[in-house]
């Protein structure tokens, strides 16, 4: 077992609330299936327990209970585990063996290591650490560089901004190219959500985006550029990635194409992963506690420094300890507009707007983005409006498995489409009442009363954790005492909520040096620079576009039932890591 896991806090990996994400099998015997489908299409479904302890499926519209179906009690076993990080036990054996702070320490202390160590750090992890130590992001960045470079012997350290920018740009390009497809394109950068879809909702797989996450893109870039800068082989490079989520360990182990000596012969493969080890901010703190020779906060007054570099500007330090051939170094640790998960939905709309301005001559001053709230703070919709009347594109953000389950229910193929297209009578009556009360039918007021529907947009940014990546399972937990100001007497959940908001505030202080959301020609030109650089990178290193940016997905069925999977993974350790939940 990991040192992070104890019987007392099995539910600390997704805060502030945990709910089992395994959907119960539908055993509804109600013969009026048409009515049920209609309710599911226009409302939301919740699972509740009645006073007798029986599970009930409650169909609601506008918060009003419409229909109740009794369910059989869900049977949960380890074979059902989705490795969602809500409890890490199912994947503990594999993940601790390959991706843990203990393995990192072993690699660092190995007398025959002969490895060049490099590290990339996510924006959310930097914010979590800065909040935990009550320092600014800039100071935390300097402390992290000091820790990894001067104390732990790493050669290079970078932020994940370049990988994220390329991921955002290519994600938007894919959605634009697939815009004519029926139903929304669903993001795939959250490995917990992806594994859930692969194991339980295979009909969702064709809707998933095929663009890699910033972690994997960064890994490919960093290993190749380090290899060239130091004239060494990729197998001699050890890449550590610090991420906000434990599921990122699973992502790094996906059975993808790594590095091929012969791009024409895919059977000749060298298993050199883009990311060798993934740890979280929480695990980094554990490492520091177990290894007192490493200190994130140097002791006073004889603190070790970056050879006096702590007095330099943080931008100069970023440049000094990145690979010399790393591009756009001034942006390498910068932030992006939109949500704390990377802003994929928001930036898709802005990149699409810039594309319309550049290619079709639209007036950039006539665009607006309207926000439509959902039934809770973890779901909302955005619409790109032109000239105050025409909706040209739409996107949604969906966080947390409760909202994800409602979304996948709506996206499930249904042969009775004619009924699904009907407006629910309750919705029709509500709209009639609004008109009778003299409500304006203007676009702006109509949007105010609408509820976000992620199933009807072009693109959905999906994250398994409530509040998104800023609340990832690997982020540092808040104190359990009243050490946070103005929290005396508050319940722990409220303290956790305040903590997350403060971490989000830290995240938002990371400067946005190149804003994809700016409706300007310069923004489009900057995007073109990134695209041109990545194309030159592919040619220079003889790497295909698919190798750098693309990922594929397959249904992952339960082996304990004897059902064969669609991939030959009997001898594939990466596939074993992904399917370990079905082997317990």
Swiss-Prot record:
Keywords assigned: 4Fe-4S, Iron, Iron-sulfur, Metal-binding
Highest taxon above the source species: Eukaryota
GO biological process, one term: iron-sulfur cluster assembly
Example GO molecular function: 4 iron, 4 sulfur cluster binding
Binding positions ([4Fe-4S] cluster 2): 190, 245, 465, 469
Binding sites annotated in the UniProt record for [4Fe-4S] cluster 1: 20, 81, 84, 87
Biological role: Component of the cytosolic Fe/S protein assembly machinery. Required for maturation of extramitochondrial Fe/S proteins. May play a role in the transfer of pre-assembled Fe/S clusters to target apoproteins.
Membership in a protein family: Belongs to the NARF family.
Name of this protein: Cytosolic Fe-S cluster assembly factor NAR1
Record organism: Candida dubliniensis (strain CD36 / ATCC MYA-646 / CBS 7987 / NCPF 3949 / NRRL Y-17841)
């Amino acid at each position: 077992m990991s040192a992070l896991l104890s019987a007392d806090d099995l539910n600390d990996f997704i805060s502030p609330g945990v709910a089992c994400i395994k959907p119960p099998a539908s055993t509804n015997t109600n013969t009026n299936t048409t009515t049920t489908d209609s309710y599911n299409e226009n409302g939301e479904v919740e699972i509740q327990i009645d006073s007798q302890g029986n599970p009930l499926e409650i169909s609601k519209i506008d918060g009003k209970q419409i229909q109740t179906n009794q369910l059989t009690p869900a049977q949960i076993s380890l074979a059902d585990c989705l490795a969602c990080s809500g409890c890490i036990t199912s994947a503990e054996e594999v993940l601790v063996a390959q991706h843990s702070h203990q393995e990192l320490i072993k690699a660092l202390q190995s007398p025959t290591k002969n490895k060049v160590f490099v590290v990339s750090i996510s924006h959310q992890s930097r914010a979590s650490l800065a909040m935990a130590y009550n320092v600014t992001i800039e100071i935390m960045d300097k402390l992290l560089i000091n820790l990894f470079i001067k104390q732990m012997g790493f050669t290079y350290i970078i932020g994940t901004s370049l990988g994220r920018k390329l991921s955002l740009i290519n994600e938007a390009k894919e959605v634009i190219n697939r815009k004519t497809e029926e139903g929304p394109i669903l993001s795939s950068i959250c490995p917990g959500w992806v594994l859930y879809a692969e194991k339980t909702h295979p009909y969702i797989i064709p809707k998933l985006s095929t663009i890699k996450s910033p972690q994997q893109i960064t890994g490919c870039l960093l290993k190749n550029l380090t290899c060239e800068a130091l004239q060494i082989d990729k197998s001699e490079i050890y890449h550590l990635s610090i991420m906000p989520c434990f599921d990122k360990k699973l992502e790094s182990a996906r059975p993808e194409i790594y590095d091929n000596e012969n791009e024409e012969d895919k059977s000749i493969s060298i298993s050199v992963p883009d990311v060798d080890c993934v740890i979280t901010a929480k695990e980094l703190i554990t490492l520091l506690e177990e290894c007192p020779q490493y200190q994130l906060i140097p002791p006073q007054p004889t603190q070790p420094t970056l050879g006096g570099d702590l007095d330099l500007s943080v931008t100069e330090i970023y440049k000094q300890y990145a690979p010399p051939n790393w591009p756009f170094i001034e942006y390498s640790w910068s932030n992006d507009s939109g949500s704390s998960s990377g802003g994929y939905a928001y930036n898709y709309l802005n990149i699409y707007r810039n594309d319309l301005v550049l290619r079709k001559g639209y007036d950039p001053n006539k665009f607006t983005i309207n926000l439509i709230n959902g039934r809770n703070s973890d779901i909302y919709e955005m619409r790109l409006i032109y000239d105050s009347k025409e909706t040209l594109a739409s996107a949604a953000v969906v966080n947390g498995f409760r909202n994800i389950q409602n979304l996948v229910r709506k996206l499930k193929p249904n042969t009775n489409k004619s009924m699904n297209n009907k407006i629910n009578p309750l919705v029709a009556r509500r709209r009639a009442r609004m008109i009778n009360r003299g409500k304006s039918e203007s676009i702006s007021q109509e949007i105010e009363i609408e509820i976000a529907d992620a199933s009807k947009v072009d693109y959905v940014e999906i994250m398994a954790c409530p509040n998104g990546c800023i609340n990832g399972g690997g982020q540092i937990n808040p104190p359990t005492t009243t050490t946070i100001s103005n929290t005396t007497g508050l319940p722990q959940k409220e303290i956790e909520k305040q903590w997350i908001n403060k971490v989000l505030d830290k995240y938002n202080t990371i400067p946005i040096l190149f804003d994809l959301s700016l409706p300007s020609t310069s923004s489009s030109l900057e995007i073109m620079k990134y695209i041109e650089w990545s194309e030159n990178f592919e040619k220079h290193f003889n790497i295909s576009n698919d190798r750098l940016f693309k990922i594929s997905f397959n249904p992952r069925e339960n082996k304990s039932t004897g059902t064969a999977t669609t991939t030959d993974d009997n001898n594939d350790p990466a596939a074993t890591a992904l399917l370990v939940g079905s082997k317990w």
